[in-house]
Curated annotation (Swiss-Prot):
Residues 14-26, 47-60 have a biased composition (Polar residues). Disulfide bonds: none annotated. Residues 27-40 have a biased composition (Low complexity). It comes from Arthrobotrys oligospora (strain ATCC 24927 / CBS 115.81 / DSM 1491) (Nematode-trapping fungus). It comes from the Eukaryota. Regulatory protein; part of the gene cluster that mediates the biosynthesis of sesquiterpenyl epoxy-cyclohexenoids (SECs) such as anthrobotrisins and arthrosporols, metabolites that possess a novel hybrid carbon skeleton consisting of a polyketide-derived epoxycyclohexenol combined with a terpenoid-derived monocyclic sesquiterpenol substructure (PKS-PTS hybrid). The SEC pathway plays an important role for fungal soil colonization via decreasing fungal nematode-capturing ability. Disruption phenotype: Displays significantly decreased fungal growth on nutrient-rich media, while no significant difference in fungal growth was observed on nutrient-deficient medium. Displays also distinct fungal colonies with different morphology with much less dense and thick aerial mycelia. Leads to a 204.4% increase in conidial formation and a 7.6% increased germination rate. Shows slightly decreased trap formationand exhibits significantly decreased nematicidal activity. This is Transcription regulator AOL_s00215g275. Residues 13-65, 84-108 are annotated as: Disordered. Residues 88-106 have a biased composition (Basic residues). Induction: Expression is down-regulated by the HOG1-MAPK pathway downstream transcription factor MSN2.
Length: 275
């Protein structure tokens, strides 16, 4: 009864006999390893294998117990291991989400400060009044190109005597049309004594964007040569440009001028000084 219970609990491996002094010695001694009765599989299992190690904490072994791993499987495992290492390194090098949000807030604050400064500068540089007429000498109507200014009533300031026979007021639609030019070459612009040669070549400067009404300074040009080939501009005269001039009759006009560029003025053969 005891024997059958012994086989039931431990399988086919019998327990050592009580009289073990008469059973053969299965454990090899230290000096007789060559006479060991262990099978090759048992020796392989008993011998600890030394796996290949790396700094990442992942280990690779070329065999599982006594069975070698195929080279194709080893290459696949190595590929997976390299991919894991790359992902781990990339994750460590990337800044955290909180750090990204902090940098983004800083950039937005810098942009907001710059925009507020730029807005303040633009507000200070904004002219008191916007020119009420537009001008484009590149239009097919711009055969005779002159500069004109408007008074607050929307009327073009001309010589009261109209010695050139030009009307003092034109159709408003024509005034605000940027592709229309109706002025004569010698048309008087200022009233009274302030109409001296204001029609000299300023149209060329305006058409190329060289003036802007943004401050109270005046630009005085002493032409060395004619800015136009038209005979009506053949007389060389001084030209004074001012942003806001009060006429003798009380009218206040605005020049349609843009940005001052000394290089552009020199190309036109003029010596200009910003006063």
């Amino acid at each position: 009864m005891f024997t059958s219970l012994r086989f039931l609990c431990f399988g086919n491996t019998p327990l050592p006999s009580l009289n073990s002094s008469r059973s053969p010695q299965r454990t090899p001694s230290l000096g007789s390893s060559s006479t060991s009765s262990l099978s090759p599989i048992e020796e392989e299992l008993a011998t600890p294998s030394t796996p290949e190690s790396n700094d990442s904490g992942l280990t690779l072994s070329s065999s599982i117990g006594p069975y070698p791993i195929p080279s194709s499987l080893m290459r696949e495992v190595e590929s997976i291991r390299s991919h894991i290492l790359q992902q781990k390194s990339r994750h460590q090098n990337q800044p955290s989400r909180r750090h990204k949000q902090k940098n983004r807030r800083q950039r937005l604050q810098e942009v907001a400060i710059k925009q507020s400064i730029a807005s303040s500068i633009r507000e200070k540089a904004k002219p008191i009044a916007t020119p009420t007429c537009y001008y484009d000498v590149s239009s097919p109507y711009a055969e005779d190109t002159s500069v004109f200014e408007l008074n607050p009533a929307g009327e073009k300031n001309t010589n009261e005597e109209e010695e050139f026979g030009i009307a003092s007021q034109h159709d408003w639609d024509e005034m605000i049309n940027p592709h229309y030019n109706y002025l004569g070459a010698q048309e008087q612009i200022w009233d009274g004594d302030l109409d001296s040669s204001a029609y000299w070549g300023l149209d060329d400067l305006i058409s190329q964007g060289y003036f802007e009404t943004y401050d109270n300074s005046s630009v005085v040009c002493h032409p060395k040569q004619d800015a136009n080939t038209d005979e009506s501009y053949s007389i060389s005269k001084a030209l004074t440009i001012s942003r806001n001039v009060k006429q003798p009759n009380g009218d206040t006009g605005w020049w349609l001028v843009k940005h001052v560029d000394p290089r552009a003025l020199s190309k036109l053969g003029s010596d200009c000084v910003i006063l």
